[in-house]
């Protein structure tokens, strides 16, 4: 065959191959699987959303081997709304969280993150859903700080925290302001150091302080460093708006259906009106008196947590089996004589009989609460009935509805309860006058004592686990656990 013909054939083969290649390429470009999917579609395709948060008393913590926290529950609600699994990535500081988000290891961050101009340059924020005010905290008994620019003592904040960012801003106005950062301690640890007198001051959000004072009553608010800072979820800035739009939609619905208000009530609705002496006395008695009766509470708490039953008993009698009141109530659970008879209690001053009778009475109140009330709020309605009677509790619900509020939401009903003391309102209800304001305070106090008992019990369990590790001659000190956990979580994310 002539050389010319061979070259032509070779050339034609090349053209044909090029044509086939271009055709395949154009076909691929037109295929759906080649088109990059949106961020939200990617989350749904992999069936999980990765949410970063921070260990702490408001955002995320483990209690009784169960995850809890305002931000955790809200993130779980969002994952359920999307129909995907929630993969929570907990860290110990804002700096760690920001770094994971910046590197794209998270879909979003939910950890009481304050929106600042500097952070807006780095991240996109969802809608604000509550506000906080950072506080300078000091130890009760120490001189109260008066001037942020002339403090005597050391301020320590977690490295990379909102507190550090705020101090940097304040330093522009107060050149003498000095502080130090700690990369190995989180907010709660620094609060404990203030309570123990190891450091003079730290800076925390008011919501964190209010909850932590129930465990460390020595903590005292020194001054407000800023007001009404907005908290929101943060996500990476991308041209793709799908995740952002979804979050906007989610929050809009949750504001409308009252879910966020319900969470706010659950975690922050009972932490106002801190009393140093009362809290300190309670913690002392929880350590000295409660162990004597703990097994009785565990035995007879059938429908509620035994620690809640113990909290009710403390509110009633301060765990005094011989407690008496001028109104005629007696014993650990301060039962009236008719109630005691109805519950089969022969001796109200006998600790076990009183606890058993009080638990039975609470069970009856729980069963009578209308089914329309959410299960996790029924106990607060039952406690109101326990305190002022079932009829008055129902009056408060009816009045709540008449005022255009939700009679099934404790956050609404507790605001209406004090109206039962006002003639303008108690004339309109079936059972008349009631000490509604006292009932509201009663429930709030029980909730505060309950939270403190949960914390104490959790601390005891942690101490017990540490003792078991020591007995096993663990070579790694407890302080080394933290970075290992974080490193392992980050490693797992990276391997995905």
Curated annotation (Swiss-Prot):
Topology of the protein relative to the lipid bilayer: Peripheral membrane protein
Signal peptide range: 1-31
Pfam short name (any one): SLT
Keywords, comma-separated and alphabetical: Cell outer membrane, Cell wall biogenesis/degradation, Lyase, Membrane, Signal
Spans annotated as LT domain: 273-496
Protein name: Membrane-bound lytic murein transglycosylase F
Gene Ontology MF: a single term: peptidoglycan lytic transglycosylase activity
């Amino acid at each position: 065959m002539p050389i010319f013909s061979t070259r032509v054939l070779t050339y034609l083969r090349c053209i044909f191959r090029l044509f086939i290649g271009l055709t395949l390429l154009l076909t691929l470009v037109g295929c759906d699987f080649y088109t990059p999917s949106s961020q939200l579609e990617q989350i749904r395709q992999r069936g999980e959303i990765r949410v970063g948060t921070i260990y702490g008393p408001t955002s995320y913590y483990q209690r009784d081997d169960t995850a809890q926290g305002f931000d955790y529950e809200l993130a779980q609600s969002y994952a359920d709304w999307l129909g995907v699994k929630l993969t929570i990535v907990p860290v110990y500081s804002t700096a760690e969280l920001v770094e994971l988000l910046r590197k794209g290891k998270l879909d979003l961050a939910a950890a009481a993150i304050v929106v600042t101009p500097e952070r807006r340059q780095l991240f996109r924020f969802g809608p604000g859903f509550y506000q906080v005010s950072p506080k300078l905290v000091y130890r009760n008994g120490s001189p109260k700080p008066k001037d942020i620019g002339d403090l005597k003592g050391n301020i320590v904040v977690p490295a990379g925290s909102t507190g550090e960012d705020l101090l940097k801003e304040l330093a522009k106005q107060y050149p003498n302001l000095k502080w130090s950062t700690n990369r190995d301690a989180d907010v709660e640890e620094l609060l404990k150091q203030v309570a123990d007198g190891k450091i003079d001051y730290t800076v925390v959000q008011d919501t964190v302080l209010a909850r932590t004072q129930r465990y460390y009553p020595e903590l005292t608010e020194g001054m407000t460093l800023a007001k009404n800072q907005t908290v929101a979820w943060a996500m990476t800035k991308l041209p793709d708006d799908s995740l952002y739009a979804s979050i906007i939609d989610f929050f809009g619905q949750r504001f409308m259906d009252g879910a966020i208000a319900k969470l706010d009530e659950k975690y922050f609705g009972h932490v106002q009106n801190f009393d140093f002496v009362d809290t300190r006395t309670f913690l002392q008695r929880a350590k000295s008196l409660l162990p004597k009766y703990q097994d009785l509470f565990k035995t007879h708490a059938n429908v509620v947590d035994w620690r809640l039953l113990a909290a009710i008993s403390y509110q009633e009698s301060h765990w005094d089996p011989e407690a008496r009141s001028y109104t005629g109530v007696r014993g650990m659970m301060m039962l009236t004589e008719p109630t005691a008879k109805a519950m089969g209690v022969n001796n109200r001053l006998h600790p076990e009989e009183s606890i058993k009778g009080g638990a039975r009475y609470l069970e009856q109140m729980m069963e009578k609460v209308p089914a329309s009330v959410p299960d996790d709020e029924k106990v607060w309605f039952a406690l109101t009935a326990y305190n002022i009677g079932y009829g008055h509790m129902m009056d408060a619900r009816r009045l709540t509805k008449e005022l255009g509020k939700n009679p099934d939401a404790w956050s609404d009903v507790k605001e209406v309860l004090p109206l039962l003391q006002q003639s303008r309102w108690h004339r309109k209800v079936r059972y008349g006058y009631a000490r509604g304001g006292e009932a509201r305070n009663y429930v709030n106090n029980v909730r505060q004592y309950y939270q403190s008992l949960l914390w104490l019990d959790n601390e005891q369990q942690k101490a017990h686990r540490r003792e078991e590790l020591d007995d096993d001659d663990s070579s790694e000190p407890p302080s080394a656990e933290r970075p290992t956990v974080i490193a392992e979580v980050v490693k797992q994310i990276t391997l995905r």
